[in-house]
């Protein structure tokens, strides 16, 4: 992903498609520059103000970096160890966590350190690698969010068709395809990324495109492929999902009241909570099927369990309607969490996409408007996308919170508590009635009927 780089203390060789800093047509890499905060001459800005801004930037970078590393590592460990969380949706969330971790590890240090040191000291290989890995990470995150939206749409609106292909093996193939496609899409970054001297003992990692037209075409291409088209696809998918869930909840509510009145009139008994019939809701069909987890995500069950579930389907009743409604509510919670993830992702990346496109078509105007604190905030906001997902999971995913607690308990088991010994002048504890009953039952069962 291409980010603007602005440098206050260095003047580039002149304008052009690969020119540096405050000149028109600059196209620079994710702020891993010798940049400070503004294109103004250093003497105009007070030393105290610059030191304060630098301290704030370092603090924010450190917080975002630590939260990204810790949070995404936690997601990877929890989703890897918890068998109950091995759903198709969580497979894509695992890939999303890996891409966010890659963004934090491969890009953040090489963004902050050159800003502190005033020059890029890591060489051409690191320069090209950082540019490439950042683009791959952003592309993988976007494609994973699109895959999650389509998977949720299929699971909720087309459940019968979805169960044919909605397996973890198919999800693994889709995830592999997203990584390969992202890797191919971002090949121009290492090709056109160079380390260029821009002053005495000052090096800068930057993109040097063949012409301004190529740079404009590339910016528009990324804007369409990684922002507008995915945004439209996800908006349509989640809109249809929300409509289906609303109609499903209303349908089950009406069915529940009708079934209860019918059972009361006929003197029937409530049924179980097994799979129910398919019903039509606004063009989307919903079915409650075996193998669906409580969070509304499909899990793979052995074939024997599926066959046994089919053979032992209980009679429909009020309990079945309530179970269907509970499953719909669980799906609604999952979709709400996924919507928050999508909104936060686009909120974090919309400013940098807009800034890159603006700079590609109007370099001087973009630099005048964005130099200083605005571009620093835009850079930090784009990196913050790597640490928001763990927070969303912890606050909105009850099962993920429980899995985190279980993982921590497994890694740090508590020592067994020693029973307090009775004092010499105390009587031994008297067994309770329940203990005596269990003892008598065990004795009788062991000895047999006389």
UniProtKB/Swiss-Prot annotation:
State one Pfam family annotation: 7tm_1
What are the disulphide bonds in this sequence? 127-205
Stretches the record annotates as Disordered: 258-277
Q: Where is the lipid attached (S-palmitoyl cysteine)?
A: 411
A Gene Ontology cellular component where this protein is annotated is: plasma membrane
Q: Where are the transmembrane segments?
A: 58-79, 88-109, 132-150, 171-189, 220-242, 337-358, 377-397
User: Which residue ranges does the entry give as Extracellular-facing topology?
Assistant: 1-57, 110-131, 190-219, 359-376
In which tissues or organs does this protein occur? Answer: Stomach and brain.
Q: Name one GO molecular function term.
A: gastrin receptor activity
Domain of life, per UniProt, equals Eukaryota
Segments on the Cytoplasmic side according to the record's topology features: 80-87, 151-170, 243-336, 398-450
Q: Where does this polypeptide localize?
A: Cell membrane
Q: Which InterPro entries match?
A: Cholcskin_rcpt, Gastrin_rcpt, GPCR_Rhodpsn, GPCR_Rhodpsn_7TM
List the membrane topology term(s). Answer: Multi-pass membrane protein
Q: Which UniProt keywords apply?
A: Cell membrane, Disulfide bond, G-protein coupled receptor, Glycoprotein, Lipoprotein, Membrane, Palmitate, Receptor, Transducer, Transmembrane, Transmembrane helix
Q: What does this protein do?
A: Receptor for gastrin and cholecystokinin. The CCK-B receptors occur throughout the central nervous system where they modulate anxiety, analgesia, arousal, and neuroleptic activity. This receptor mediates its action by association with G proteins that activate a phosphatidylinositol-calcium second messenger system.
Write down what this protein is called: Gastrin/cholecystokinin type B receptor
Native source organism of the sequence? Mastomys natalensis (African soft-furred rat)
Which lineage do the record's taxonomy fields give for this organism?
Answer: Eukaryota, Metazoa, Chordata, Craniata, Vertebrata
Gene from which this protein is expressed: CCKBR
